Regions:
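Short secondary-structure boundary/capping segments
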Residues: 2-4, 20-27, 131-133, 174-183
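Short, surface-exposed, polar/charged, turn-prone segments marking secondary-structure boundaries
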Residues: 7-11, 33-37, 44, 120, ...
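Active-site neighborhood of phospho(di)ester-bond hydrolases with catalytic His/Asp-centered motifs
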Residues: 1, 7-10, 96, 116-118, ...
Length: 194
C-alpha cells in the first residue's frame, strides 16, 4: 500500500491548534450567525454565504454526512519556491502566511501553466476581518503576497484556479488588471476612515 502525501504550509499544525481548538467554542457561536445555520436550506431561507451553496448532510448542516477529523501533514512546505513532484505532476509552492489564513500557501503547476491562489484571490474580497472572530488579516502583507504571485508566476500562468470561484482561462492576457486590483484592496482596507 502506498501512502498519499499530505502537504501543508509551515506552521499549519500550530495554527490549527490555536485557531480551531482554543477559540472553537466562541467561533462556533459566531459561525452560527455568520453562516446562518438556523435558517432552512431553501429559497426562503439560506441560499449561499457568497462562497457557494451549503452542503446538506442530515438536516440543516454545513457539511456532508459523516465524520470530520484531521490527518496531520506528512510533509511541511518550508519556503517559497520549494518544488515537489507527485505522480509526475510538479508542484511549486509560494508561502503566504497571514493572508486568508495564518498558515497559507499558493501552488503553481508549471507543466500545466496553472496557478492555484488558494483562497487568497477569489471572486470576492475574502475574510480580512472574519466575523466568526478569527485573527484579523494583514491587508498589506496579503497585497504584497499577491504582487509576489504576479511576479513569480504571472508570465507563466495560463489558467488560474481558486477555492470558491470559477477557474479562469487566458490569464496571460488578463494579468494587466491584477496589479490595479491588488493595490485597490490594500488601499481600501488599510487607510484610516474619515
Amino acid at each position: 500500500m502506498r501512502l498519499v502525501p499530505i502537504l501543508a504550509p509551515r506552521g499549519f499544525m500550530d495554527q490549527i491548534a490555536s485557531e480551531n481548538v482554543i477559540a472553537f467554542p466562541a467561533w462556533a457561536r459566531r459561525a452560527a450567525y455568520q453562516f446562518a445555520l438556523g435558517l432552512p436550506l431553501d429559497a426562503k431561507g439560506f441560499v449561499t454565504s457568497g462562497d457557494g451553496p451549503r452542503y446538506s448532510g442530515s438536516g440543516n448542516t454545513i457539511s456532508a454526512a459523516g465524520t470530520t477529523s484531521l490527518i496531520p501533514p506528512t510533509h511541511e512546505i518550508t519556503h517559497t519556491g520549494e518544488v515537489i513532484t507527485i505522480d509526475g505532476v510538479r508542484l511549486e509552492f509560494q508561502l503566504t502566511p497571514g493572508t486568508e489564513a495564518p498558515a497559507e500557501m499558493n501552488i503553481f503547476l508549471p507543466d500545466l501553466q496553472t496557478l492555484c491562489l488558494a483562497e487568497n484571490a477569489g471572486g470576492t474580497l475574502h475574510n480580512l476581518l472574519p466575523l466568526r472572530g478569527a485573527e484579523v488579516r494583514d491587508a498589506k502583507a496579503w497585497a504584497e503576497y499577491l504582487t509576489e504571485s504576479l511576479r513569480l508566476y504571472g508570465s507563466r500562468t495560463e489558467y488560474l484556479v481558486t477555492q470558491h470561484y470559477w477557474p479562469r482561462w487566458a490569464m496571460t492576457a488578463s494579468w494587466t488588471m491584477f496589479p490595479r486590483n491588488v493595490t485597490r484592496t490594500n488601499t481600501f482596507t488599510t487607510r484610516p476612515s474619515g
